[in-house]
Amino acid sequence: PETIARPRRSHRRLPFMPAPTAVVTLTDVLAARRSLAPYLQPTALYNYPSLSAMLGMEVWVKHENHQPIGAFKVRGGIHLIDNLPAEQKRAGVITASTGNHGQSIAYAARLFGVRAVIAVPQGANPAKISSMRNLGAEIVFQGADFDEAREWVEAEAGGMGLRYVHSGNEPHLIAGVGTYALEILEQQPR
């Protein structure tokens, strides 16, 4: 039998949160590339013949590990924070994360002088927590897992006066990370 997971509670709209199902277009991704240009260089795309031979197909690797936080998510964090209205930048941001998303928001917040609060669950990767903290984020331990940390953020963001940054439903975040696909198409257009 097939089991279908149901969300624990319905999704509600939070302060400053974009409407669900926002569509991100190629125009949005091109705008994100312009926004990111002063802060990030394109990453290399390499073909590894031995890896291709081992897998029996042509394989190309996009080296997002060369980004400042070692992950592609920094693209989304920078584009999102760069495009926040001034009042939201002054207020600061809050999000939940177990790692790369939090690092992305912490890095971008430091870049633009914005306060960042990151809720992490108990037991989250200590190296990721240390990185977020070193990037200037305020770390708050909440819950046993990501969902509990996220639920805490959703409940507290408005009362704290912070702009909630959803880890996925953010058009600027999505457009920012989409820039790596543009680079792939330009670097290996076939």
Predicted features and spans:
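Short amphipathic, helix-prone segments within low-complexity/disordered or flexible regions
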Residues: E2-A5
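Short, low-complexity intrinsically disordered segments enriched in A/P/G/S/L with frequent Arg
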Residues: R9-R13
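PLP-dependent amino-acid enzyme catalytic core
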Residues: F16-R190
